[in-house]
């Protein structure tokens, strides 16, 4: 078991929405839980784009906007959103950078020398570089100068045919520290596979919870 406790921090690399029958409920849980830090995924960004268009069309009827947002979700989701949750979702960053690692949805852009481009230098008008790119997940992509990059976006099964976290170790490293890895592909495709994965940065071990069929 993952055994997440009050003393832990949980990092979620996006794609909270559109990944199951109760994604609105999941969004509210994560946005309002202590010790949880999330970044935007492409699905959240698409939802926010829809939300912003609704706000432009109905600037004086905010209740109507909230009601209209329900149409985004499955009719059986049964968990209408509130303004506090929407404000927190809108404030999510495109990436989180810590001392030893970076959390981002799809990966970091690379220059022609395979060196990572600092995420803060990505133009604000081009979030797709951090949200949509599918090249960073390729095993042959080895960033040369980066902290460990934790990312998701595409289920690992499309790389390895397995529903498990892929941690790419630096040459000659033991694997006991997060510094020993240059990237960690986290997406176990829980909606497709029923396998929820979590990588613990303290001991660099992956843990899984599997849905009972």
PLM segments and residue spans:
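Active-site neighborhood of divalent metal-dependent phosphoester bond hydrolases
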Residues: 6-7, 20-99, 109-110, 116-119, ...
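Residue-level marker for buried hydrophobic side chains located in beta-strands
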Residues: 10-12, 38-39, 102, 150, ...
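Divalent metal-coordination and catalytic microenvironments
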Residues: 15, 30, 41-42, 89, ...
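Short acidic, Gly/Ser-rich segments with clustered Asp/Glu that frequently serve as metal-coordination loops
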Residues: 17-24, 191-193
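Short, glycine/acidic-enriched loop or turn micro-motifs at the edges of active sites
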Residues: 18, 45, 108, 156, ...
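Short, well-ordered beta-strand micro-motif
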Residues: 97, 103-105, 198-202
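Short, well-ordered beta-to-alpha junction loops that form the rim of enzyme active sites
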Residues: 99-109, 152-155
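Conserved beta-sheet core of the metallophosphoesterase superfamily
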Residues: 135-211
């Amino acid at each position: 078991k993952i055994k997440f406790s009050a003393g832990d921090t949980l990092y979620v690399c996006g794609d909270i929405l559109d990944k199951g029958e109760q994604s609105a409920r999941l969004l509210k849980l994560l946005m309002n839980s202590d010790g949880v830090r999330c970044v935007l995924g492409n699905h959240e960004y698409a939802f926010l784009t829809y939300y912003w268009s609704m706000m432009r069309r109905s600037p004086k009827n905010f209740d109507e906007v909230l009601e209209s947002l329900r149409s985004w979700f499955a009719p059986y989701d049964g968990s209408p959103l509130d303004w506090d949750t929407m404000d927190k979702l809108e404030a999510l960053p495109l990436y989180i950078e810590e001392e030893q690692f970076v959390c981002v949805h799809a990966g970091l852009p690379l220059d022609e020398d395979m060196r990572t481009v600092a995420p803060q230098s990505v133009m604000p008008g081009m979030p797709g570089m951090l949200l949509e790119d599918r090249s960073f997940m390729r095993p042959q992509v080895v960033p040369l100068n980066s902290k460990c990059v934790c990312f998701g976006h595409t289920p690992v099964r499309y790389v390895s045919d397995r529903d498990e976290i892929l941690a790419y170790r630096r040459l000659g490293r033991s694997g006991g520290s997060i510094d020993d890895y240059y990237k960690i592909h986290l997406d176990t495709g829980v909606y497709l596979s029923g396998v929820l994965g979590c990588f613990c940065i303290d001991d660099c071990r992956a843990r899984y919870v599997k849905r009972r069929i």
